[in-house]
Amino acid sequence: MVCGGFTCSKNALCALNVVYMLVGVLLIIVAAWGKGFGIVSSIHIIGGVIAIGVFLLLIAIIGLIGAVSHHQVMLFIYMVVLILVFIFQFIVSCSCLAMNRSQQEYLLNTTWNRMSNETRLNLEKTLDCCGFLNTTEGRDEFKQDVALCIQVCSDPHKCPSCGDKMLNHADEALKILGGVGLFFSFTEILGVWLAFRYRNQKDPRANPSAFL
């Protein structure tokens, strides 16, 4: 049978959703591992990663059940959800790729200000740095951060700011994040196309007089 028939569409859709399931499980495992080993202490970060993993897992389960059973309603819900996820993910990915250094600095500064002291100290310990950026506007806060982390930094007299270290890698990280996001965006479009095509194909084993 040539690829494009009922069986081929079904197998391709199942394979795509198995990949989504593996990615979802991997996100959950990585988040739990990071929390267990103390790599990330913020419950908001851990909860966000786990929520994304669970959401992706649920979408994959709906798509897999719909593909195996050729369930019209499940396949329709699957397509609608994937389209919405694609739109959101595409916008976020393009924003990551288009972000300049000043925008990166503003975003990192906003994130830094929302961090708890415990999260800041863990980040400073991991990056071997103190404070965010020693700017005119944030000099007082920078001095307070340096005073808190002076024992954490391996070399207190030559301790760089965390903002400088993060900005040095932010551009590369955003490009990777945007590229991976765009890749998954197009796999979601592939999933929508496969689900639409498969949904409108008749099961050759079904009753010929039955609807699809």
UniProtKB/Swiss-Prot annotation:
InterPro entries: Tetraspanin/Peripherin, Tetraspanin_animals. It is a multi-pass membrane protein. Belongs to the tetraspanin (TM4SF) family. One of its GO terms (cellular component) is membrane. Keywords: Glycoprotein, Membrane, Transmembrane, Transmembrane helix. The chain crosses the membrane at residues 13-33, 45-65, 73-93, 176-196. It comes from Xenopus laevis (African clawed frog). It holds the Pfam family Tetraspanin. It is found in: Membrane. Residues 1-12, 66-72, 197-212 are cytoplasmic. Glycans are attached at residues 100, 109, 117, 134. Residues 34-44, 94-175 are extracellular. This is Tetraspanin-31-B. Signal peptide: none annotated. Its main location: membrane.
